[in-house]
Amino acid sequence: MARSVSSFKFLGASVFDALYVSISRRGYSGAPPAAVTASFGRPGAMGKVERRYAMKESSSSETRAYSSAWAPDPVTGYYRPENCGAEIDAADLREMMLNHRVRSQ
């Protein structure tokens, strides 16, 4: 009898845990959009819009040239963004920004 009560407690606890997990679990999908569209309706069937979109994607990716946003710096050799301007020393920047006009009295 004691054995059946302990197994009932274990079974009840495991059912409660499974129910709690299923309620508190968030449903994020890991499937790519093509797999989702292909899963509805006939297996492997794609509509005209999806087929046209897939053809545009494949043709544009083949014609597109590869470019990276990072390029090696000619001075240091380290990689830095391509669109980054040249660095200016603080003293040079201060000299450019300060107005050196002498006021005549």
Curated annotation (Swiss-Prot):
Q: What induces it?
A: By water stress; in leaves.
Q: Which UniProt keywords apply?
A: Stress response
Biological process (GO) annotations? Answer: response to stress
Say yes or no: keyword NAD present: no
Which InterPro entries does the UniProt record give?
A: LEA_3a
Question: What start and end residues bound the annotated signal peptide?
Answer: none
One matching Pfam family, short form?
A: LEA_3a
User: What highest taxon heads this organism's lineage?
Assistant: Eukaryota
Family stated for the protein in its record: Belongs to the LEA type 3 family.
Q: What is this protein called?
A: Late embryogenesis abundant protein Lea5-A
Q: What is the scientific name of the source organism? A: Gossypium hirsutum
Give me the gene this protein comes from: LEA5-A
